[in-house]
């Protein structure tokens, strides 16, 4: 299997693990600090405290639009968990891209370097 395919598969596996962990530990309702405010402003598409977080509010509204009012908090929290999982995925790919650029010799990467690069991506993400 070539490095590119292995990198993609490993990245999506890391994403799946992160998604499982985030969704299984997610609050079903609100928790402390600003979470309640963000859930409310995302559900009603209102202005939160400065500086706001317009992209978060729009995504939260998109997720909560498909839920009943009782489940709006769970949907906004699941959107936050999925967003965090995608950030883990892109962090993994960023680390492996940098590792690949550092380890490449003559345009080729050997098996040991591939394992080290993917391992560093998993640990770093």
Residue map of PLM features:
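Membrane-water interface of alpha-helical transmembrane segments
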Residues: 1-11, 77-80, 114
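Transmembrane signal-anchor helices characteristic of membrane glycosylation enzymes that use polyprenol
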Residues: 5-32
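Transmembrane-helix motifs of polytopic, lipid-linked glycan transferases
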Residues: 12, 78-110
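Membrane-water interface at transmembrane helix exits
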Residues: 26, 60, 64, 92-100
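Extracytoplasmic catalytic/substrate-binding loops of multi-pass membrane glycan-assembly enzymes
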Residues: 26-38, 48-60, 71
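Membrane-interface elements of multi-pass transporters and channels
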Residues: 28, 66, 70, 98-106
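Membrane-embedded glycan-lipid processing machinery
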Residues: 63, 72-82
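Short helix- or helix-capping micro-motifs
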Residues: 116-125
């Amino acid at each position: 299997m070539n490095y590119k395919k292995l990198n993609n598969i490993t990245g999506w596996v890391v994403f799946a693990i992160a998604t499982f962990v985030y969704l299984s530990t997610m609050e079903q309702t609100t928790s402390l600090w600003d979470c309640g405010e963000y859930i409310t402003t995302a559900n009603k598409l209102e202005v939160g405290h400065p500086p706001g977080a317009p992209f978060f509010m729009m995504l939260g509204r998109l997720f909560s639009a498909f839920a009943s009012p009782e489940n709006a908090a769970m949907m906004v929290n699941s959107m936050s968990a999925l967003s965090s999982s995608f950030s883990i995925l892109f962090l993994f790919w960023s680390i492996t891209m940098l590792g690949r650029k550092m380890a490449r010799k003559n345009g080729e990467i050997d098996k040991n370097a591939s394992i080290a690069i993917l391992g560093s991506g998993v640990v770093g993400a």
